[in-house]
UniProtKB/Swiss-Prot annotation:
Family matches, as InterPro entries: Glyco_trans_19 (IPR003835)
Functional pathway: Bacterial outer membrane biogenesis; LPS lipid A biosynthesis
SUPFAM superfamilies (UniProt xref): UDP-Glycosyltransferase/glycogen phosphorylase (SSF53756)
Classification lineage: Bacteria, Pseudomonadati, Pseudomonadota, Gammaproteobacteria, Pasteurellales
EC number of the protein: 2.4.1.182
Top class in the EC scheme: transferase
Role: Condensation of UDP-2,3-diacylglucosamine and 2,3-diacylglucosamine-1-phosphate to form lipid A disaccharide, a precursor of lipid A, a phosphorylated glycolipid that anchors the lipopolysaccharide to the outer membrane of the cell.
Family recorded in the similarity comment: Belongs to the LpxB family.
Annotated source species: Haemophilus influenzae (strain 86-028NP)
Any GO BP: lipid A biosynthetic process
Record protein name field: Lipid-A-disaccharide synthase
Gene Ontology MF: a single term: phospholipid binding
Reaction equation(s) it catalyzes: a lipid X + a UDP-2-N,3-O-bis[(3R)-3-hydroxyacyl]-alpha-D-glucosamine = a lipid A disaccharide + UDP + H(+)
Amino acid sequence: MNKTNPTIALVAGEVSGDILGAGLIRQLKAHYPNARFIGIAGTRMLAEGCKTLVDMEELSVMGLAEILKHLPRLLKIRKNVIQTMLQEKPDVYIGIDAPDFNLDVELKLKANGIKTIHYVSPSVWAWRQNRIHKIAKATHQVLAFLPFEKAFYDKFNVPCRFIGHTMADAIPLKPNRAEACQMLQIDPAQRYLAILVGSRGSEVEFLAEPFLKTALLLKEQFPDLQFLVPLVNEKRRIQFEAIKAKIAPNLDLHLIDGNARQAMIAADATLLASGTAALEAMLCKSPMVVGYRMKPLTYFLAKRLVKTDYISLPNLLANEMLVPEMIQEECTPELLAEKLSAYLSDDESAVKNRHILIQHFTDLHQKIQCNADKQAAQAVIDLLEGTENV
């Protein structure tokens, strides 16, 4: 490797990966001003100077049916990436998330003597644990956002570095509620519940009804309570409004385009689907209840496949039931309202418990606030310069 101008390959498959890739490139350019960056990039990575083989949108497919429909094209892109990398011989290949695409590329490149890093651990600790063996064969190192992920890799002697979470870097330890209310143009003197029904159509389909019915119950109990409903895009908004027209036509809601983070900071509590949103709510210091429903067959299979005691990231990080998880038959308006009312109550013990929970959230935030972009870049530098065992 030329010490001053390495060729660094990065492949991102969706917007979240493009954001990570851009942050990583920025840090690597500070160390290697003349480095060359190639791969599959979105607009942010392109702006940082990465050359792309194809438009990143070509890889952004969700759901089994969609993947099957686009499979020939995806396989063609993967073949093209492998051939290009074997010709270019980059000093390192960094697969950013998109494990179903990237791990096969990494496997081929590592077998041909190219150093590989997988950035963002697949959820092997939760399900399909046998993937760990493929990851071990495919990568020289995994970069993990969360400490329990590294602990899992350590058990299998797979090189892994905990780098902290970029979201923990982006959100202050003490979020500014007044600022969030101002951004959303809402009255800071009011009390709010944030309701996040998920970003996928299937989540809105299963969760909008119980979440709206929960809001109706809470409105009876707390007449002054207002509701903030951030929706990820126009499609989800139309879907949600159609369900609301049937379930709660007279319920006043603040429907918000995006801005989930500001909604959670402004709110006194949050009702949400599981997923990254639960981690974000924790970082926003918003007491939360996690509710989730899926098709009975999906739930039956998931229960047998998932190997963890908890499903939400705050509970996984704390390794205890910090926040209620109301899954499937427990995801009822009555139970959700009961759990949320404990956060919204003014009585002394409820206020004290809320303070204790927020302190837990702050402690966990500090644990994963490590300047992840910089840590990721350092891991790449160590691998390139031979200070990391390969």
